[in-house]
Amino acid sequence: MYKNIKKFKLESFIAQEIGNLIVSGGIKDPRIHSFLTVVKVEFSKDLINAKVFMGSIKEGASLDNAVKALNNAKGFIQSQIIKRIKVRSTPKLLFVKDDSLSKSFYVNKLIEGLNTTREN
């Protein structure tokens, strides 16, 4: 039970810190834009590896390039996280593209289109 609580807190903290780094412009790469968002973070059972699922709230934004840039900058990101958290070892980050946000925007547009046709 304690490990599950610790895992959940770490996942939340990592997501928040990565989001803060992106929004504040702490990562100096033009491929990383402020429309990126951390969808979720999943740790392995041993808390050594973490998958960070990234999405974009802007349509047409190049999520593939942004994920590549984040994977290139993961050493820097890990070093920034370790400054703010007290753990024995820094989790190894792997950034992964998550299309769920863009799919949900698409579904919302479809629903809005249906509502517009019903009103007319």
From Swiss-Prot:
GO CC terms of this entry: cytosol
InterPro entries with a match to the protein in the record: KH_dom-like_a/b (IPR015946), RbfA (IPR000238), RbfA_dom_sf (IPR023799), Ribosome-bd_factorA_CS (IPR020053)
Chief location category: cytoplasm
Pfam families linked: RBFA
Subcellular location: Cytoplasm
Statement: the UniProt record of this protein carries the keyword Cytoplasm: yes
GO molecular function: ribosomal small subunit binding
The entry's keywords: Cytoplasm, Ribosome biogenesis
NCBIfam families linked to this entry: rbfA (TIGR00082)
Record's function text: One of several proteins that assist in the late maturation steps of the functional core of the 30S ribosomal subunit. Associates with free 30S ribosomal subunits (but not with 30S subunits that are part of 70S ribosomes or polysomes). Required for efficient processing of 16S rRNA. May interact with the 5'-terminal helix region of 16S rRNA.
Complex formation: Monomer. Binds 30S ribosomal subunits, but not 50S ribosomal subunits or 70S ribosomes.
Family: Belongs to the RbfA family.
Protein name from the UniProt record: Ribosome-binding factor A
Organism: Borreliella burgdorferi (strain ATCC 35210 / DSM 4680 / CIP 102532 / B31) (Borrelia burgdorferi)
Organism placement in taxonomy: Bacteria, Pseudomonadati, Spirochaetota, Spirochaetia, Spirochaetales
